[in-house]
């Protein structure tokens, strides 16, 4: 029997049975879940009603994540699934779905921050810089450009929770797209109250 999204196979509100008065219809069909995993990109196309296409992502390893407070969006690697409000099984099997909390690689955001503000981010005290990083952070600039960077530095403060994550090289992010429908795992970096909330949840889960 196929997966069906009808309601006439359920009992009535009064508890009585319903007699099926027609067979299953094409418009009542359902399809098996995509259960998108982390791995080299594998996407199937599905022909749907109206001749349209859906992109069923079976495996994904990168996504486009937006750092809201800094208006910076970068393509980055998805490392792990750490929390899912709807189902712990999806965390255990590392399944990518909408609104699951994942760890992403922080390198693209750190590179952007350091070139935009000319300030180090998430560096250990006294850590050696590579010549390229040295060039970006300690470059000789004209007075006019230096003034522009000094203006930017006034707003360069980021929260201590984010800074800790940058030191570990991984950021917590939330997936906002639907990988099994559009074939992408895009989302946003967690910040502020939302980040505090999910850190508490993850800690409570680990403590069990």
Swiss-Prot record:
In-chain residues carrying the UniProt-annotated modification Phosphoserine: 160
Name this polypeptide is given: Small ribosomal subunit protein eS8
Entry GO MF terms: RNA binding; structural constituent of ribosome
GO terms of biological process kind: cytoplasmic translation; maturation of SSU-rRNA from tricistronic rRNA transcript (SSU-rRNA, 5.8S rRNA, LSU-rRNA); ribosomal small subunit biogenesis; translation
Organism whose genome encodes this protein: Homo sapiens
Record family assignment: Belongs to the eukaryotic ribosomal protein eS8 family.
Localization of this protein: Cytoplasm; Membrane; Nucleus, Nucleolus
Compositional bias of kind Basic residues: 8-26
């Amino acid at each position: 029997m196929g997966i069906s999204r009808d309601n006439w196979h359920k009992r009535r509100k009064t508890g009585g049975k319903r007699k099926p008065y027609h067979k299953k219809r094409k418009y009542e069909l359902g399809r098996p879940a995509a259960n998108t995993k982390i791995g080299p990109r594998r996407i199937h196309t599905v022909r749907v009603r109206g001749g349209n296409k859906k992109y069923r992502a079976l495996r994904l390893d990168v996504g486009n994540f937006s750092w809201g407070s800094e208006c910076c969006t970068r393509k980055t690697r998805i490392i792990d699934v750490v929390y899912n409000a709807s189902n712990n099984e999806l965390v255990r099997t590392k399944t990518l779905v909408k609104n699951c909390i994942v760890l992403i690689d922080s390198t693209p955001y750190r590179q952007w921050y350091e070139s935009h503000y000319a300030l180090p981010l998430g560096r250990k005290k006294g850590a050696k810089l590579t010549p390229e990083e040295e060039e970006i952070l300690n470059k000789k600039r004209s007075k006019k450009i230096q003034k522009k960077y000094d203006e930017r530095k006034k707003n360069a403060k980021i929260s201590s929770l984010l800074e800790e994550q940058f030191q570990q090289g991984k950021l917590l992010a939330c997936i906002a797209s639907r990988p099994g429908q559009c074939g992408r795992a895009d989302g946003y970096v967690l910040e502020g109250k939302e980040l505090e909330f999910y850190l508490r949840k993850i800690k409570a889960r680990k403590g069990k």
